[in-house]
Amino acid sequence: SNAHGTHVAGTSAGAAFLSEHMIAFGEEGATPSAGSVRLAPGLGLTNRFVIDQHFRQRDRLGRLLTALAYNPFAVGIGLDEDTAAFIAPDNTVHVEGSGGITVVDAAEVRFSSMAQIDEGRPVCLLGMKLHILTQGATFNLHTRLADAGALISPKT
């Protein structure tokens, strides 16, 4: 739901478009690098997160890390294919589907070399948090805490 309580949804690029800042272009690969991502205005329904889609299938960790190096206030959400992030009214992200969600939290980044390096160079990021959530696990966008939820129960 958005701030007015209206349910919103998007798939693929439509999911990325929901937030205030969206990744309009980005190089694939695991290493963040200066200038490898172009952000564009999104629909602006939230400024709390940046969404990237087809995340693991297209090796997009580096571009999400780069986007957060530019905008460390936001939480990065990488959606695997066949997977959705349901955000409850209490700002808790729930995973639905057969894949996972990668949550990247830049709130505690204590150093980023983004301002000191030339375009195309790798970015140094210290203090970045990364969570891999599957169905049953959650992440609260307000407290920025991940929880294993139902996954803690032993397999029967």
Predicted stretch roles:
Residues 22-156:
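C-terminal and late-domain segments of enzyme folds
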